[in-house]
Swiss-Prot record:
Listed Pfam families: SlyX (PF04102)
InterPro entries: SlyX (IPR007236)
PANTHER family, alphabetized: PROTEIN SLYX
Family in the record: Belongs to the SlyX family.
Protein name: Protein SlyX homolog
Source species, domain of life: Bacteria
Region ranges (Disordered): 56-75
Amino acid sequence: MTEKLIEQLEARINDLECQVAFQEQTIEDLNSALSQQQLQITKMQDQMKYVVGKVKNMDSSNMEDPANEPPPPHY
């Protein structure tokens, strides 16, 4: 191989190594973001279960029939 070809191949290998390093960092960043989002989703799911449970357990006697309520003051 000629000296020029060797230099070109070395430059290409160097470029590929830089790209791989950048991609590895990007993958780590995306993995971290995904992990944080999964924790947030799990927390929100737990909160939704709590709220749904509270709504289901509400005493229905607290809710009166709208027909029994007096009309608003503007009538």
